[in-house]
Design a protein with these regions (language model features):
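Active-site rim elements
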Residues: 2-3, 123
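Conserved acidic-Pro-Pro-aromatic motif
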Residues: 26, 41-50, 56, 65, ...
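SAM cofactor-binding core of SAM-dependent methyltransferases
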Residues: 3-76
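A short acidic, often aromatic-flanked loop/helix-cap motif at beta-alpha or helix-coil junctions
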Residues: 72-77, 153-157
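Short amphipathic alpha-helix with an adjacent loop that forms part of the alpha/beta core around
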Residues: 19, 77-87, 106-111
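A broad, low-specificity signal for short, low-complexity segments enriched in glycine/proline
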Residues: 11-14, 79-82, 124
Length: 194
């Protein structure tokens, strides 16, 4: 099955592999921004996935998923209502809210939802490790496994910087795939070659 990535750092390709080419997945995309350009979920939608798209600015209204205009770090009433009705197990959570990522992370319904796979933009290269370390600590305490730490992107051209962390909930993911992609401080294209 042909899978064309739209993500900035291959997040959709990683999820596609880790979810074993699942075609009926559910995602939560916080910081969805543009409908297609650098979208972590658009290609998954093209393969049958559906979900919730949230951003503080318009841009994803024409997607198959449900778009909510809200600050994910300070959810409005509509977003809080949707959080009450998302599945107990969500296949993929993507967090890319720039400086509000930690706030969006903290606002999620962790008490009633388990996320099979998570990619979270940490921007360690520009913000330092404090927010990344807080999220890592909280996710580890909830039973998540850091599969790919400090995933590197090339930005600007010719410069490689730590950008994201990718997690899995081990009880919901093939352990051989966790082992296959296990890495730290690796350029995203090299992770996907494994």
């Amino acid at each position: 099955m042909n899978f064309e990535s739209h993500a900035q750092a291959g997040q959709d390709l990683w999820v596609w592999e880790m979810a074993e080419h699942k075609t009926d997945g559910y995602y939560v995309d916080l910081g969805c921004n543009d409908a297609r350009f650098h979208s972590n979920t658009y290609a998954l939608e093209e393969h049958g996935w559906k979900g919730l798209l949230v951003d503080i600015v318009c841009g994803c209204e024409n997607r198959k998923g449900t778009f909510i205009l809200s600050d994910a770090a300070a959810p409005n009433e509509r977003l809080r209502l949707y959080y009450k009705h998302i599945p107990a197990v969500v296949d993929y959570l993507t967090l890319d809210c720039d400086d509000a990522t930690l706030g969006a992370f903290n606002a999620l319904p962790w008490d009633r939802t388990t996320f099979r796979l998570i990619t979270v933009e940490t921007d360690v290269y520009r913000k330092g490790p404090a927010d990344r370390d807080k999220m890592r600590t909280m996710l580890k305490a909830m039973g998540y496994h850091l599969v790919c730490g400090d995933v590197f992107v090339e930005w600007p051209e010719g410069t490689f910087v730590p950008y994201e962390d990718w997690f899995a909930f081990p009880d919901l993911v093939n352990p051989q795939l966790i082992k296959r992609f296990q890495s730290d401080g690796v350029f995203w294209k090299d992770i996907l070659k494994q």
